[in-house]
Amino acid sequence: NYMAHQEIHALVRSALAARAGRGAYRLLDLGCGNARLLADTLREFPPAHYVGVDLSRPALAEAAQQLRGLPAVELREQDMLSCVASQADDSVDVIYSSFAMHHLSTAEKARLVVQIGRALKPDGQWILVDVVRAEGQSRDTYVREYREMMTRSWADFAPEHIEQVWGHIAQFDYPEPVTSLAAMARAAGLTEPNVLGQFGPHAAMTFALPR
């Protein structure tokens, strides 16, 4: 639970439970991976239609097994930007993304958020789980401090495994501060972020498209 998956998933479960209580909903999962962490919640509060998108074919194959039994599942081997851009206007009730958006550049994130705002139905919700930088924290400082946190806290990981994970972070992670995400959301017509919880750099938040 080094990335607070248990705590964050409980928050996501509550958000989806609240949405399911309002009636049938369509969910788009950006960067779904193998869908393992979300599968139980989706079985508890099944969407009328689930679309999961990821670039990893093996992960999607595993997701198909994890999501077996849901009413309608569509899995796509596609990047997040093109997937959201292909959605019709006002067509999705919930857009969910977990630990995926930070791989995009700032400009790509801004374009993605605009497309999210376009694709959501009025009163639709974007649930974002991701790493974030502290206000005023540079990316270099974030990467260094994340490595320090792993070295200090990831007791069950061998040093060479920590170095491997850190190498991936140093090369591919480009997290934003919450204020930057808020500015992108405003530009897309979304509400200010409702931060459900933050555990170090790991955060869960929701945005909504006003009615």
Question: What is each of the regions a protein language model found here?
Answer:
Residues 23-33:
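Conserved class I S-adenosyl-L-methionine
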